[in-house]
């Protein structure tokens, strides 16, 4: 047992619940704003088009179609909303 271990033992409270509470309080504002933006009508419609495309492509065994365009449309709509709201939530 070294000096560092002894100092660590003296400074830690040893209460794992306290450490968990501190970790739970941290919430990424980007995640929160993205979730809010995904509820907007424009994003909901883009997600529906993406999900329909995914179902269509998944149901076929041999297809060259992919859902890249639909994915980019959804991400663009969501990120456009996020860009206007994110910095209002930062300190």
Swiss-Prot record:
> What subunit structure does UniProt give?
Component of the ubiquinol-cytochrome c oxidoreductase (cytochrome b-c1 complex, complex III, CIII), a multisubunit enzyme composed of 11 subunits. The complex is composed of 3 respiratory subunits cytochrome b, cytochrome c1 and Rieske protein UQCRFS1, 2 core protein subunits UQCRC1/QCR1 and UQCRC2/QCR2, and 6 low-molecular weight protein subunits UQCRH/QCR6, UQCRB/QCR7, UQCRQ/QCR8, UQCR10/QCR9, UQCR11/QCR10 and subunit 9, the cleavage product of Rieske protein UQCRFS1.
Q: Which organism is it from?
A: Homo sapiens (Human)
Q: Which residues constitute the organelle targeting sequence?
A: 1-13
Where are residues bearing N6-acetyllysine located in the sequence? Answer: 42, 85
Q: How does it sit in the membrane?
A: Peripheral membrane protein
Q: Region Disordered: what ranges? A: 1-30
Q: What is the lineage of its organism?
A: Eukaryota, Metazoa, Chordata, Craniata, Vertebrata
Disease implicated: Mitochondrial complex III deficiency, nuclear type 11: A form of mitochondrial complex III deficiency, a disorder of the mitochondrial respiratory chain resulting in a highly variable phenotype depending on which tissues are affected. MC3DN11 is an autosomal recessive form characterized by recurrent episodes of severe lactic acidosis, hyperammonemia, hypoglycemia, and encephalopathy.
Question: Where is there biased composition of kind Acidic residues?
Answer: 14-27
- What are the protein's GO molecular function terms? ubiquinol-cytochrome-c reductase activity
Q: Where in the cell is it found?
A: Mitochondrion inner membrane
**UniProt-recorded name of the protein:** Cytochrome b-c1 complex subunit 6, mitochondrial
- Tell me the keywords, alphabetical order: Acetylation, Disulfide bond, Electron transport, Membrane, Mitochondrion, Mitochondrion inner membrane, Primary mitochondrial disease, Respiratory chain, Transit peptide, Transport
The GO cellular component terms are: mitochondrial inner membrane; mitochondrion; respiratory chain complex; respiratory chain complex III
